[in-house]
Amino acid sequence: MTFSADDINQTLDASGLRCPEPVMMVRKTVRLMQEGETLLVIADDPATVRDIPSFCRFMDHTLLASDTEQPPYRYLIRKGLN
């Protein structure tokens, strides 16, 4: 799956990090973003396949797209109202 550069406001490369670090970095990055902005997350920890979608649901952000067929995994998140 490809993501258009026009769809991405920020990119976070969490490659090489293991749970819980990728989600902690996503949380920190999203907190500094404006509502509606998008974040492309790149990670290679298999736990992110479960953790990133759960984080989005719990924090009311939108997981616009994901590519989890093989590492590196990619997730496109739109910041919600939090």
From Swiss-Prot:
GO annotation, cellular component aspect: cytoplasm
UniProt subcellular location: Cytoplasm
Catalytic residues, chain numbering: 19 (cysteine persulfide intermediate)
Key word Metal-binding present: no
GO biological process, one term: tRNA wobble position uridine thiolation
SUPFAM superfamilies assigned to the protein according to its UniProt record, in alphabetical order: SirA-like (SSF64307)
InterPro entries: Sulphur_carrier_TusA (IPR022931), TusA-like (IPR001455), TusA-like_sf (IPR036868)
A Pfam cross-reference name: TusA
Entries under Gene3D superfamilies matching the protein: TusA-like domain (3.30.110.40)
A molecular function (GO) term: sulfur carrier activity
PROSITE patterns to which the protein is assigned, alphabetical: UPF0033
CDD domains named among the record's database cross-references: SirA
Record has Lipoprotein as a keyword: no
Keywords: Cytoplasm
Family membership noted in the UniProt record: Belongs to the sulfur carrier protein TusA family.
Function: Sulfur carrier protein which probably makes part of a sulfur-relay system.
Full protein name: Sulfur carrier protein TusA
Protein's organism: Tolumonas auensis (strain DSM 9187 / NBRC 110442 / TA 4)
Gene: tusA
